[in-house]
Design a protein with these regions (language model features):
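GST-like fold's C-terminal all-alpha helical module
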Residues: 126-213
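Acidic/histidine-enriched, glycine/proline-rich intrinsically disordered or flexible terminal extensions
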Residues: 222-248
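Short Asp/Glu-rich motifs
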Residues: 42-45, 210, 228-229
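Active-site-flanking alpha-helical
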Residues: 96, 187-188, 219
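GST-like domain detector, emphasizing the conserved glutathione-binding G-site
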Residues: 1-146
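A short structural micro-motif
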Residues: 121-122, 212, 225-228
Length: 248
């Protein structure tokens, strides 16, 4: 078996890092995790527009990011021996191929195509929700009101989840845990961070995600991850507490 090393940003905040980490962990893969930090994310950002504005912050140079293990400037990156795989969904695809017994995609071809479709929708969509509801596993923001555009994204997520669960019968989107669930886990986390009520049709799904051993392990690992100033400052600017949901 090749050596697997997943290079991530802090699992406290990085939704793109959480996704393949969950897929690999659920699959039972043996892999090491290396956490890197980007210098520009420890600076002071502008939050006056209700989002994280990095316009006036000089980004960490591409050469520095590559020195940390990136391929094209972003993280995560999975190294299979010395071969890098970048992009979260591609890493999840590798996990599905390398560990077929984990069932990370549905067996039925049509359901597998649907699972891939909603995973791709997560990659390319929901821009307003991602901008306004910055991912923060342990933070909580009381009294938060999403913008109209963000609410549209939230409504679409509930529509999508409800349709999948009605068809599959649960407990996960396609019956058993799949890459689709890994892709949407950070959305569930975001909704909790900002106090967005869950649609009644997805309450049991949320509980099934909470009970998943890979998710419980992620929360345990993430609480020890390095802090990112910009994300903590953003929650404070909204009147929130970055540590409100820390265990213990």
């Amino acid at each position: 078996m090749p050596h697997l090393k997943l290079t991530v940003l802090s699992l406290r905040y990085s939704s793109w890092s959480m996704r393949p980490w969950l897929a690999l962990t659920h699959a039972g893969a043996t892999f090491s995790t290396e956490t890197v930090e980007l210098a520009h994310m420890q600076q002071q950002a502008d939050f006056s527009a209700g989002t994280i504005d990095l316009t006036n912050i000089e980004p960490t140079p591409l050469s520095d990011r590559r020195a940390l293990g990136s391929v094209h400037g972003l993280f995560p990156v999975l190294r299979v021996d010395d071969v890098p795989i970048h992009e979260s969904l591609a890493i999840c695809e590798y996990a599905a191929e390398a560990f077929p017994g984990a069932g990370l995609w549905p067996e039925d071809p049509l359901e597998r195509a649907q699972a891939r479709a909603i995973s791709c929708e997560m990659v390319g969509g929901f821009a307003s929700m991602r901008d306004q509801l910055s991912c923060h596993l342990f933070g909580r923001v009381p009294g938060f009101v999403p913008s109209a555009e963000t609410q549209k994204d939230i409504d679409r997520v509930f529509e999508l989840w409800s349709a999948c669960l009605e068809h599959s019968g649960g407990p996960f989107l396609f019956g058993q845990f799949s890459i689709a669930d890994a892709m949407y886990f950070p959305v569930l986390s975001r909704l909790r961070t900002y106090g967005i009520p869950l649609a009644a049709t997805v309450a049991d799904y949320a509980q099934a995600i909470d009970n998943l051993p890979a998710v419980q392990k992620l929360l345990d690992v993430a609480q020890h991850g390095p802090r990112t100033k910009i994300y903590d400052d953003y929650l404070r600017a909204l009147g929130g507490d970055p540590d409100a949901a820390l265990p213990g």
